[in-house]
């Protein structure tokens, strides 16, 4: 009996070790996948493949404490060569999704900075009003004028883009329309932006008037359950028995926002087999191309969206592509 118990004990101990090793290995794999997410997004198009890779710049990071408790800190990612060179770089400010902080998006924002952008994030977990984006621009203006700052006279304030995920969608729309620095925004990107159905339900600063966004705008979302839902219009209430679910950013919402946008260059597209949680990662290459096109005049990047045969119109991983160019 003692031998049997001893054998069982050994088996249990070995199993525990194996489980521990497995969990550690899975943890390392998950960490690596998050840090190198761009290797797992399955790029197909030539432009998508190019901008899914890291850019040519190493990336430096600097943090600033905010006087606003909701914002907490600002984190700025920038091309490391700015530590030793005097040149200006365009800007992208990022608006977090609900409950997310800057570190949720670290690898994603470093990727963007590696393509030549000064990228600003913060720890605001409720970004919808756009106030924290506006505060980020205040910080950039201050640092650009500060002779003691590593970013002194290196921030191209004439080329500012904003992007946001989920609740960050209303944030960028509100930043571009009602915040004090709205007139400094050159282009807007929103991935899985909260639909008007939900913003009306939530109230409290969630609502936005996208018809007042007067700069080029890219709208993206996934086709899976939480983003797409099953509802086909804002008029349908979620009804589990009837099989109706209002997704966070369904196709009808993309169509509605595209239609309401004024006479500006605009695009919407969905990626197949993608859902809300990591949609920002899945669209990263085309987001980078969008900002490169509008903030650095990268003509090749623009071919993803416009022209006789825009890449997104033929990329098999994407659907429902629609574009308008003046």
Predicted segments with their positions:
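The feature captures the conserved acid-bearing segment of alpha/beta-hydrolase catalytic domains
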Residues: 185-277
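Short amphipathic alpha-helix adjacent to the substrate-entry channel of hydrolases
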Residues: 103-122
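N-terminal Sec-pathway targeting helices
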Residues: 1-17
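Gly/Ser-rich "nucleophile elbow"/oxyanion-hole loop immediately N-terminal to the catalytic nucleophile
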Residues: 83-88, 131-171, 178-179
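Alpha/beta-hydrolase-fold serine-hydrolase catalytic core, especially in secreted/extracellular enzymes
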Residues: 2, 263-265, 271-326
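Short beta-strand element of the alpha/beta-hydrolase
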Residues: 86-97
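N-terminal cap/lid segment of alpha/beta-hydrolase-fold proteins
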Residues: 31-88
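Conserved hydrolase catalytic core segment
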Residues: 175-185
């Amino acid at each position: 009996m003692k031998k049997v118990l001893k054998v069982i004990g050994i088996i249990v101990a070995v199993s525990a070790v194996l489980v521990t090793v497995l969990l550690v290995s899975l943890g390392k794999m998950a960490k690596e996948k998050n840090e190198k997410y761009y290797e797992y997004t399955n790029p197909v198009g030539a432009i998508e493949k190019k901008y899914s890779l890291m850019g040519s710049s190493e990336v430096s990071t600097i943090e600033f404490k905010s006087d606003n408790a909701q914002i907490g800190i600002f984190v700025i990612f920038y091309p490391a060569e700015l530590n030793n060179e005097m040149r200006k770089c365009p800007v992208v400010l990022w608006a977090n999704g609900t409950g997310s902080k800057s570190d949720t998006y670290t690898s994603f924002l470093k990727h963007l900075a590696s393509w030549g952008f000064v990228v600003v994030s913060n720890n605001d977990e409720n970004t919808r009003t756009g106030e924290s984006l506006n505060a980020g621009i205040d910080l950039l203006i201050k640092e650009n004028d500060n002779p003691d700052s590593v970013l002194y006279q290196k921030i191209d304030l004439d080329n500012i883009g904003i992007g946001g995920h989920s609740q960050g969608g209303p944030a960028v729309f509100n930043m571009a329309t009602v915040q004090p620095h709205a007139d400094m925004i050159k282009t807007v990107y929103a991935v899985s932006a909260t639909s008007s159905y939900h913003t009306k339900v939530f109230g409290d600063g969630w609502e936005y008037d996208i018809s007042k966004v007067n700069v080029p705008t890219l709208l993206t979302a996934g086709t899976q359950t939480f983003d797409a839902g099953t509802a086909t219009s804002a008029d349908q209430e979620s009804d589990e028995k009837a099989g109706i679910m209002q997704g966070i950013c369904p196709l009808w919402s993309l169509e509605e926002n595209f239609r309401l946008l004024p006479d500006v260059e605009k695009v919407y597209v969905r990626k197949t087999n993608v859902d809300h949680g990591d949609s920002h990662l899945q669209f990263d290459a085309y987001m980078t191309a969008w900002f490169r096109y509008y903030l650095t005049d990268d003509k090749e990047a623009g071919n993803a969206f416009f022209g006789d045969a825009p890449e997104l119109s033929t990329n098999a991983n994407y659907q429902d592509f629609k574009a308008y160019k003046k």
